Amino acid sequence: MKTLTFTSALLISITLSSIGVMGSNLAASENHSGSQGNVGPVADRLAIRELIESYMAAVIEQDADKWIANWAEDGVWNLGGGDISGKDRILESWLTIMAPYKHTAMFGQPIFIQVEGDEAVAHWHTNERLRLFSGNEMLAVGRYKDRYMRIDGAWKIKRRDYSVVFTTAGSPE
């Protein structure tokens, strides 16, 4: 395997686990223990799945407008290197992160989705395959810890905290 490019190494280095917890009775804190079942109306849980499916499809399509449309105006994104706050800064960061990738694939599986009124939390496992313009590839399995808000009748991402479960990188063989 070839050495990672600087950009890939930078991306990996910032994906350390970090989560900020907002006040709520929902159970998505780091102290979350055992109660990983789905809670709340099925229609809301389905709408949140569709929100994250839209997010992942936009990653695959590298469609910045579709991707950022999933976020609340005051959303927060944390890849382990600190909070990125507000849609403008989140989009700017995403464009920088995505710039070296020719192809991306992202697929997610919810561990649980819990809804309480107009707030929700979920944890997701993701499988990500990335191909750089250089031809090098990277595979990552990650975990998102999310918070959502219903805003004007639609679910939006309020906060996403990402951590890497494992990653591999190298040249296509």
Language-model features: locations:
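Positively charged n-region of N-terminal signal peptides that target proteins for export
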Residues: 1-5
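Bacterial N-terminal signal peptides
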Residues: 8-20
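Short, low-complexity N-terminal intrinsically disordered segments enriched in polar/charged residues
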Residues: 25-61, 65-73, 89
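Short beta-strand edge/turn micro-motifs at domain boundaries
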Residues: 32, 121, 141-171
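A solvent-exposed, acidic/Ser-Thr-rich amphipathic alpha-helical stretch
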Residues: 51, 64-126
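Outer-membrane beta-barrel domain signature
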Residues: 71, 77, 166-169, 173
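Beta-strand elements of well-folded, non-transmembrane domains
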Residues: 128-132, 164-165
